[in-house]
Amino acid sequence: MASETETFAFQAEINQLLSLIINTFYSNKEIFLRELISNSSDALDKIRFESLTDKSKLDAQPELFIHIVPDKASNTLSIIDSGVGMTKSDLVNNLGTIARSGTKEFMEALAAGADVSMIGQFGVGFYSAYLVAERVVVTTKHNDDEQYVWESQAGGSFTVTRDTSGEQLGRGTKITLYLKDDQLEYLEERRLKDLVKKHSEFISYPISLWTEKTTEKEISDDEDEEEKKDAEEGKVEDVDEEKEEKEKKKKKIKEVSHEWNVMNKQKPIWLRKPEEITKEEYAAFYKSLTNDWEEHLAVKHFSVEGQLEFKAILFVPKRAPFDLFDTRKKQNNIKLYVRRVFIMDNCEELIPEWLSFVKGIVDSEDLPLNISREMLQQNKILKVIRKNLVKKCVELFFEIAENKEDYNKFYEAFSKNLKLGIHEDSTNRTKIAELLRYHSTKSGDELTSLKDYVTRMKEGQSEIYYITGESKKAVENSPFLEKLKKKGYEVLYMVDAIDEYAVGQLKEFEGKKLVSATKEGLKLDESEDEKKRQEELKEKFEGLCKVIKEVLGDKVEKVVVSDRVVDSPCCLVTGEYGWTANMERIMKAQALRDSSMAGYMSSKKTMEINPENSIMDELRKRADADKNDKSVKDLVMLLFETALLTSGFSLEDPNTFGTRIHRMLKLGLSIDEDESAEADADMPPLEDDAGESKMEEVD
């Protein structure tokens, strides 16, 4: 009896993706097979993992396999696996009604000219079936549900039916592709064998092709007569007696038989010696492991022997995946095998988060086969393996660094990871620090390492100077650099948000302290004459410092005469152990931040004034003449707010700041306030009735 068929609509994004796949011309449609085999392999991994703790999970189908069946009579290609299978809700959700996080990103990538072969990286590889098929039928059986059939011609909807009459799978999934008329090449044995060799040779389950075998068999005429007896029956023939007496002649007939032909007979690549493996073989293995369409950037193949034995191959990709730092997604990076048996992927205990971009496999001789995720967390063997993997990864990065061009590519993609490593990995911190690269006041367009910086340090220089900020452009003309540049000191530009965290942990390099140009405590060597002049200026400007402090109140902790600013009138520095302006900006941008922390970490600002600046000198004269002069207060507020901006802070009230600038423009243009009073009706006055500067209210 036919079961009831339910119809579902594809989720909008998936529908959009399908229409892109069907209606756009792609030259490399062949990748569909790689994607479907990869999905089968994942399903087999899942059932194998489940069976480690419960052997009965394999009862319905003890063999783990992938079968490929081309059928020229019906123009269909089927890919069958004995994996975990799907329940009805899996079918509905995974194949149509719930879009993966990667669906939108993949479409954006396609629109930007990316290759369709990227599809697997975005978790939507199944839909590549529609590159070659006009109709797709998925029959599946999960241990916890009945057998179901999913079917769609990608016209906006799909159907799901309980399968009571079809061939029963026992467990697993069969995907049948009804090929388009111009895609019948994928029924050819040669083409399918080539594709498996090219893309899926290193899948760890046997991939068998249903092949047609034609053999020639010799039979005598006698046997032939026997075989034809039925056909001949009822016919009247004249038998030539002479012929009958002649020697029976032999004749050949063609016999057609079918058999399974295993296409991936390679032994695991990691068991072979590195020197015997070609670059192409590593590339093929990397692609089958990661679904990447590009080759890897670098590879490390090694084995550890002694008290502990394991083999590993680690790869560094050429690009960072689109969701590298997506904390909701478990990165599927290192596959764990125990004595050639696959145990699990995304084994978080094998590699720290900062190395989450490294792909590869680890095959251990010592772990128990039935190890669970819970046991992994406590496992001492795993901790030793992890330590070795981290060490080998760092070695690999140094190998990449030997080629400047390769390292620039690597650094562009994964510098954030290295900086996260500085923050998280205290054991390897000093080693990772050697891999960091920054622009600096002397490096031009090139990046420089800390090691190179140290070799260029001036005689007598004992500290490494750096400045943090939003971008290279934002910091290269910062007032904080004026004195350092004038004295010929090199300053590193740390303009990545994560630099703030990294430099907080990396307090020194090769015995040289890292000092921020934007914080208190910047001490530059001065001659006796310079020191004497500085003392005189401090005395001369002491009165102005007090006036500024009175005007600004608790907006600043103190006001001092600067020895770091050369051209700008003033700047705002932060405490040595508090947040920099850049860090404050980063923390404000975090939606889920703990605002209580901001109170004590965003340290009080110190205003440093430049006594050599003509604006400051004029301000000093006015303040000395009359400290209650309203223009002094207005100018102090304007200087403070401008210093907030040039020092990298944000304004609490940009509108009042704007109003103040407009007033200054009017003064400069000699526009009478009364004439423009009507136009300015909605502007706050600079002075209120009490004679207090409105500007003071800006915080």
Swiss-Prot record:
Keyword Glycoprotein in annotation: no
GO cellular component, one term: cytosol
One family name in Pfam for this protein: HATPase_c_3
SUPFAM superfamilies per UniProt: ATPase domain of HSP90 chaperone/DNA topoisomerase II/histidine kinase (SSF55874), HSP90 C-terminal domain (SSF110942), Ribosomal protein S5 domain 2-like (SSF54211)
Alphabetized UniProt keyword annotations: ATP-binding, Chaperone, Cytoplasm, Nucleotide-binding, Stress response
Gene Ontology annotations of biological process type: cellular response to heat; protein folding; protein stabilization
Keyword Zinc in annotation: no
Region (Disordered): 215-250, 674-699
Binding site for ATP: 39, 81, 126, 373
Basic and acidic residues compositional bias, start-end: 228-237
Cellular localisation: Cytoplasm
GO MF, any single term: ATP binding
Biased segments, Acidic residues type: 674-690
Function text: Molecular chaperone that promotes the maturation, structural maintenance and proper regulation of specific target proteins involved for instance in cell cycle control and signal transduction. Undergoes a functional cycle that is linked to its ATPase activity. This cycle probably induces conformational changes in the client proteins, thereby causing their activation. Interacts dynamically with various co-chaperones that modulate its substrate recognition, ATPase cycle and chaperone function.
Subunit and interaction comment: Homodimer.
NCBIfam families linked to this entry: PRK05218.1
Name by which UniProt lists this protein: Heat shock protein 81-2
Organism: Oryza sativa subsp. japonica (Rice)
